[in-house]
Design a protein with these regions (language model features):
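Acidic, metal-coordinating catalytic segment for phosphate/diphosphate chemistry
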Residues: 7-45
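A short coil-to-beta-strand element that immediately follows conserved catalytic motifs
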Residues: 3, 101-108
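Nudix hydrolase/Nudix homology domain
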Residues: 2, 6-7, 71, 82, ...
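Short, well-ordered beta-strand micro-motif
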Residues: 20-22, 46, 126-128, 147-149
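Conserved Nudix-box catalytic region and its N-terminal flanking loop in Nudix hydrolases
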Residues: 33-39, 45, 53-92, 96, ...
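Short beta-strand micro-motifs in enzyme catalytic cores
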Residues: 17-21, 57, 71, 121-123
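Short helix-loop capping/hinge motifs at secondary-structure junctions, enriched
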Residues: 30, 51-53, 131-133, 180-181
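Active-site-adjacent beta-strand/loop module that shapes the phosphate/pyrophosphate-binding cleft
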Residues: 22-27, 111-133
Length: 181
């Protein structure tokens, strides 16, 4: 287990912070590690149709991502606000990005995004019993919402059309562990 000896903040921004931690490693050596501190996030797989149907419809986003060099397919997601629960965040992001509201929000799992340099965790959910509405994206979000059958979404993962890690994990977790596909 690593033990933190000291932390030095080198950057603090709107979304994240960067620290240089001096840590004692399991072998008792002392290391300096750059750590991206993130408040955490939630992501949600919205099922437009009954999850028990043979091929449920999934709402996907085609969202412009500067870091990815353009638009990519993903599930709705966003950063936890201070004091906000992961489920509340998932519900908020679902409504903001798709316009939908969920009667049911079920927890799937929690993942570390890149534990080699960040403490970011994303809490994954599946939403069902949706009522649709108009998306209300933030001013820096450029996205389109599309419904696709889950079979097509899984094919998009196989064909590398969906390359966003949180979305792949959430969709495959849902298909494999919740729906038994």
């Amino acid at each position: 287990m690593r033990q933190c000896i000291a932390t030095r903040r080198v950057y603090s921004g709107r979304l994240l912070r960067v620290d240089v931690d001096t840590v004692r490693a399991p072998d008792e050596s002392v290391l300096e590690l750059e750590m991206v501190r993130h408040p955490g996030a939630a992501a949600v797989v919205p099922l437009l149709s009954d999850p028990e149907s043979p091929d449920p419809q999934v709402l996907l986003l085609r969202q412009y991502r500067y870091a990815a060099g353009g638009p990519i397919w993903e599930v709705p997601a966003g950063v936890l606000e201070p004091g906000e629960s992961p489920e509340t965040c998932a519900r908020r992001e679902l409504t903001e990005e798709t316009g939908a509201r969920a009667e049911h929000m079920d927890y799937l799992t929690t993942i570390f995004t890149t534990p080699g340099f960040t403490d970011e965790k994303i809490h994954l959910f599946v939403a069902s019993g949706l009522t649709t509405g108009a998306p209300q994206p933030m001013s820096d979000e450029f996205l389109e919402v599309e419904a696709r059958p889950l079979s097509k979404v899984l094919q998009m993962i196989r064909d590398q059309e969906i390359v966003d890690a949180k979305s792949i994990v959430a969709l495959l977790y849902l298909a494999g562990f919740k729906l038994g596909l």
